[in-house]
């Protein structure tokens, strides 16, 4: 199966590859690793690269993409690149400058997809995570519909081909969809999604509105990040997942990725380990049976690794809703 043809049509007519390469790494990981890993990912066949202003590696990721264009491995139009608008720039007048900053770091003319990283707006300024003396996040108050209108203008200006959201619940999506004078629907909602949090209701909602669900933390999460709730079980050690993997002579990670592909979810695979980057491309080489899919569906326990507890109390905190 040719991974290049593994694409899903977005509601604006553009196509997104169903397997994406995630570039987030904890701060202690040298940024040069993002450069090498992204280059290698493109070499082994990844055509969808996901990053964000928050990750502070767009310079390296852009360099990787440009070097693979320069050496003839790919053309710019072969690559689907996603960037994200961070929470401190949700005020409408800050949206375009934030995207232009990302483009400047990337040294690219446009991104393929620009998404609102989270609905929780934070105080504008040069701090990613503005906190008061007691260590509490300093919230901002923004109408997400106004933020959305600013994204629509970025699309019209050709700075991004498509626009979407991330970490939105269905009510927040509805708010955008029902906005008077809506010009473009969100093409996607990128959320945490894996067998322990399979997002079946949100997936159904998104499908009914022709919005693609993009899965991050598809393999669970490294329990070291400050954003992660570390009391959770390790997904890839799940006995059901391991048994299905053994049956197919695949790894539990590949089974977790394949599960999403078969549900019509676009899935991000995040690893800077060359062996695993290459291995993740094998997601197209096997198929899970309906019984396998049902068994994995049965693992759902609404466990959220990235629960962003510091955002609780914000009027737009997304995870108080069931979906």
Swiss-Prot record:
Localization terms from the record: Cytoplasm
BP GO annotations: prostaglandin biosynthetic process; steroid metabolic process
Chief location: cytoplasm
GO cellular component, one term: cytosol
Keyword Amino-acid biosynthesis attributed: no
CDD domains (UniProt xref): AKR_AKR1C1-35 (cd19108)
Site, as annotated: Lowers pKa of active site Tyr: 84
Residues in the signal sequence: none
Active site residues according to the UniProt entry: 55
Class of this enzyme: oxidoreductase
Residues in coiled coil: none
InterPro entries: AKR, AKR1C, Aldo/ket_reductase_CS, NADP_OxRdtase_dom, NADP_OxRdtase_dom_sf
Residues engaged in binding substrate: 117
Pathway this chain belongs to: Lipid metabolism; prostaglandin biosynthesis
Family: Belongs to the aldo/keto reductase family.
Record's subunit section: Monomer.
Record-given protein name: Prostaglandin F synthase 1
Organism from which the protein derives: Bos taurus (Bovine)
């Amino acid at each position: 199966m040719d991974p290049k043809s593994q694409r899903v049509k977005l509601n604006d007519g553009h196509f997104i590859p169903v397997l994406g390469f995630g570039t987030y790494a904890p701060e202690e990981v040298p940024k040069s690793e993002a450069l090498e890993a992204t280059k290698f990912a493109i070499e082994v066949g990844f055509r969808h690269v996901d990053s964000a202003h928050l990750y502070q590696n767009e310079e390296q990721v852009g360099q990787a993409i440009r070097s693979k264009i320069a050496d003839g491995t790919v053309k710019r139009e072969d690559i689907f690149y996603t960037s994200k608008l961070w929470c401190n720039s949700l005020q409408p007048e800050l949206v375009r400058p934030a995207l232009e900053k990302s483009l400047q770091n990337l040294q690219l003319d446009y991104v393929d997809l620009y998404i609102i990283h989270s609905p929780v707006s934070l105080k504008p300024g040069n701090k990613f995570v503005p906190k008061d003396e007691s260590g509490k996040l300093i919230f901002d108050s923004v109408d997400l519909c106004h933020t959305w209108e600013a994204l629509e203008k970025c699309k019209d200006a050709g700075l991004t081909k498509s626009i979407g959201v991330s970490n939105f619940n269905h009510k927040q999506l509805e708010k955008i969809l029902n906005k008077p004078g809506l010009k473009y629907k969100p093409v996607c909602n990128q959320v945490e999604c894996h067998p322990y949090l399979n997002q079946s209701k949100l997936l159904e909602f998104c499908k009914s509105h022709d919005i693609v669900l993009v899965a991050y933390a598809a393999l669970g999460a490294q329990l070291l990040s400050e954003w992660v709730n570390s009391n959770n079980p390790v997904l890839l050690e799940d006995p059901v997942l391991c048994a299905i993997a053994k049956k197919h002579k695949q790894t539990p990670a590949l089974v977790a990725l394949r599960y999403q592909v078969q549900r019509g979810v676009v899935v991000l695979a995040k690893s800077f380990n060359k062996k695993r980057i290459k291995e993740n491309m094998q997601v197209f080489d096997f198929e899970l049976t309906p019984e396998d899919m049902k068994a994995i569906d049965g693992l759902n326990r609404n466990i959220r690794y990235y629960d962003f507890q510091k955002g609780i109390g914000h009027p737009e905190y997304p995870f108080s809703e069931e979906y």
